[in-house]
Amino acid sequence: MAMKKLYAKTSFTSKKPSSAANSTPILAYHQQQHQQPGNGICEFQVVAPGHSGELMIRRSQSMHHKMSPPVGGLGSKSEYYSIEELQELDLLDYRHPMYHHYQQQELRQRYHEHEQLVLQLPKATSPKAGPIYEAPQRSQQQQDQMLYVPTAAQRDSSSSAAATSIASSSTLTSSPSPSSSSSLIFSTLRKCVSPSNPSVNPNQPSKTQPSKLGCSMSFSIRTTTATAATAAAANAATATLSTQQQQQQAQQQHKQHLYSNIHHYLIRQQQQKQHYTLQRRHNSVKDKFIGGITTIFAEQSIIGARASVMVYDDNQKKWVPSGSSSGLSKVQIYHHQQNNTFRVVGRKLQDHEVVINCSILKGLKYNQATATFHQWRDSKFVYGLNFSSQNDAENFARAMMHALEVLSGRVANNPGGPPTNGNGYEEDMGYRTMTSEDAAILRQNNSIGGHVTPSAQTPTSQTNQNNIPQSPPTPQGHHRTSSAPPAPQPQQQQQQQQAQQMGQPGSHYGPTGNGPTSNGLPQQVNSQIPPAPQQQPQQQQFQQQQQQQQYQQMVQAGYAPSQQYQQPHYVLSNSNPNLTVHQYPTQQAQQQPPQAPQPPLQNGGMYMVGHGHLPSSASANSVVYASQQQMLPQAHPQAPQAPTMPGPGYGGPPVPPPQQQAENPYGQVPMPPPMNPSQQQQPGQVPLNRMSSQGGPGGPPAPAPPPPPPSFGGAAGGGPPPPAPPQMFNGAPPPPAMGGGPPPAPPAPPAMGGGPPPAPGGPGAPPPPPPPPGLGGAPKKEDPQADLMGSLASQLQQIKLKKNKVTTSAPENSGSSTSSGGSGNYGTIGRSSNGMASMMDEMAKTLARRRAQAEKKDPDPEAEVKKRPWEKSNTLPHKLSGGAGSGSAGSGHEGANGNSGGAGSNTTNSGGESPRPMRKRFGSASEETILKVNGDGLSLALSNGDLDTLKAEIVREMRLEIQKVKNEIIDAIKSEFNRR
């Protein structure tokens, strides 16, 4: 009842309650003749008002009826409108049950003539093609009966036939047959007369079209040969037969049309449904379920991390776990390639419950409350992610920053942001396995990388970009260095391609190690990064083992670095190993033969550890170095020397490192051809290389390297004492490496252009991950940071150099402490730029702790401790690789290899281990061992006053750099707003 009223509502304009019949339904269905329910549906059937089976509407309920009262004579059914009347009055609206049927009926009538002309084809049984206008088909019996009278008739002209048929039909008008039969006959005659050759041979009834037979029947009677009686009888018989047959034909035709039109109607309905479904697919919630078909192909995971997803409860004023229970979840950022949108999706590791599924909107404020707890809000909730490790947190933060930059238009979004993709592959952390599509992309990238590497400069710049993005990921302590993509955003576009290449470097990877020297360097970088994504777990272990062996070899002989060189190529940390190797030779040359190899080992080991830890902080460093190296190859083959610079810092005099580089690189060149050429070309430019390496990470362009050389030039010019500052710089560079990850953002390139030191500071802020490498990592980072944060690194290094010159006797210690301090500053700056205020707090705490320890310990140990805290703060994620390397390895290898050897081996171990144990080692054992190792090569003479002065100076420099970074960020934001 309710539905009928609803259907009828719009059909009646009267809304007065008095006009509605409460006792009876508005729509009444008359069922007097229920036996013929289908008659009302027939397309061509004329439905009389009040015909059975039609829906009637009360006239009293229509305003139209009141305006124009009905004419009498409608009988008992005058109370209701017929469907035809409703159609005429335009009162049959779409809610009427028969509305759609009659809509279709109108369409069918409109196209009926067209269907007759085109769609009604003759049957296959007829040998001849009949006229276009066909009468309905008839059975053979009917045809024989029709042929009985005109069998003897001969064909006449069409005009005489027409006259005869008209006369005969006119005589039949008085016959008892209904008057409608005459109209049917006339229509048939018209159809028969219209063809040019309507005459048909009646002797072949079975072979002729029924329409032709009918026509011949109608006009084959010859008045000239037949008597009037014969003609009248023939005409009567013809009229009767034609009337009956045409009625039957009309029924059959109606059925055919009805069925065909129903079929068309159903097809059209299906098409409409499909059309609506396609439209609805974009807006329906059901089609957006996680893992749905639409998301599988359109969305790609750019980062994955383990974290507990929390939601802030305003009522309870506390954080509560999202979902039904607490526990770790796999949180991923998905990038929709087509819509260029991002969203965060988290599933419980235990039961795969979806605990977060929120969009990342433009302008989202991502707050890194602490090193491992990040939060943001949307229109409904305040989300918090409590990450299981700092590496995960930093990687995720970088991916989030990259997504926000892509959304804001600051970063060109290539095929999904290679950096992000790189993260997706490398960052995998066991969360995401390579798909066939990923493998194909990696293979394609590898082939591209192979072509690019042949050109030393072009590949270098690309590799630098790749390395830079990846260096941040490496710092995170996971091969996934997927964080690299977030790194230099200016470079991200190139990084996207190269990051994928690097991610693919599985193929790149082995070959590049032995590829062209200058190209090989970039390739190494690529290969380092690429393996991480595909083979992170196995490769990390394998690399760690190789690196450990390499470290031992390095400790035993100065040539060991070259082995590391090649092996690193084999491993993801190829480029880093090369750097390490070069550094090793430098240190060896600089330091006493026994001690020199050991310190190089530490430096190299640190670097190598970085490589071995490619997943860990060391890998980030190696990435930075690789990028630096690549940068250097463009400007100069200084890239190899960049690693050496850290070596000289440890070794002591910068000059010896270049020599060693020349020596060892040459000896090692065969092993790491890519690195060697650049090293050979600029053995004396270690400082420049290093600076350039610093600049390189900061910005892919060659210009970046030149600015670093000046700062390094000071160190190199200083002579052996300057090397100590370089060492400090080396220590400092790790912070830049940290910065390197974030620097990819616009800040890094400006820093590169303006001056490596300042630029790295700005970009460096985002990449805190690099610090994790530890002491060894710190020196390593020094270079990457210099690349990424040229300005900060150079300024801090200059200040440190001054301090070191004052205390040249203990350049290593001061250098290490400075480097640690520099790392801390860089890391802090980077984090601050990333908005990680917690990093500053953490650094302050570590500084206080280190100061307390330094007061208890000797000045040298204090410096070491200080260095560690800085590194620690900088490389919190990398502590395992860098710090642990120095701490744990320090105890094992430091005795034989010196501080750097121990750090190297330790780093290797830490790569496999979790960052926390490494941090502990770094904090406890590595400090003393590092101090001892540093003391072995150089005299340690730093008073507490000197340390305090150095600390104060570092703090001042940090503040200045932070202020600069803030100003740069503000300027960048202003320029962005002005652009819009």
Swiss-Prot record:
Listed GO CC annotations: axon; cell leading edge; cytoskeleton; cytosol; dendrite; filopodium tip; focal adhesion; lamellipodium
Compositional bias ranges of the Basic and acidic residues kind: 852-871
EVH2 block C, as annotated region: 947-980
Main location: other
Region (Disordered): 125-145, 194-213, 448-547, 570-614, 630-927
Annotated CDD domains: EVH1_Ena_VASP-like
PROSITE patterns, sorted: WH1
Pro residues: compositionally biased ranges: 643-659, 698-711, 719-774
Tissue expression profile of the protein: Expressed in axons of the embryonic nervous system.
Residues with PTM Phosphotyrosine: 425, 607, 625, 650, 666, 826
Compositional bias ranges of the Low complexity kind: 194-206, 490-501, 535-547, 583-593, 630-642, 677-687, 905-914
Example GO BP: compound eye development
Molecular function in Gene Ontology: actin binding; SH3 domain binding
Chain segments carrying region EVH2: 791-980
UniProt-annotated stretches for the region EVH2 block A: 791-810
Bias kind Polar residues: ranges: 448-469, 514-527, 570-581
Top-level taxonomic group: Eukaryota
Compartment(s): Cell projection, Lamellipodium; Cytoplasm, Cytoskeleton
PTM comment text: Tyrosine phosphorylated on multiple sites by Abl kinase. In vitro, phosphorylation on specific tyrosine residues inhibits interaction with Abl and Src SH3 domains.
Residue numbers of Phosphoserine PTMs: 905, 914, 924
Region of interest called EVH2 block B, as start-end residue ranges on this chain: 837-854
Protein function: Functions, together with Abl, trio and fra, in a complex signaling network that regulates axon guidance at the CNS midline. Required in part for robo-mediated repulsive axon guidance. May be involved in lamellipodial dynamics.
Protein family per UniProt: Belongs to the Ena/VASP family.
Assembly and interaction partners: Interacts with Abl and Src SH3 domains. Binds, in vitro and in vivo, the cytoplasmic domain of robo. Interacts with Zyx102EF and chic.
Name listed for the protein in its UniProt record: Protein enabled
Organism in which the protein naturally occurs: Drosophila melanogaster (Fruit fly)
Source lineage: Eukaryota, Metazoa, Ecdysozoa, Arthropoda, Hexapoda
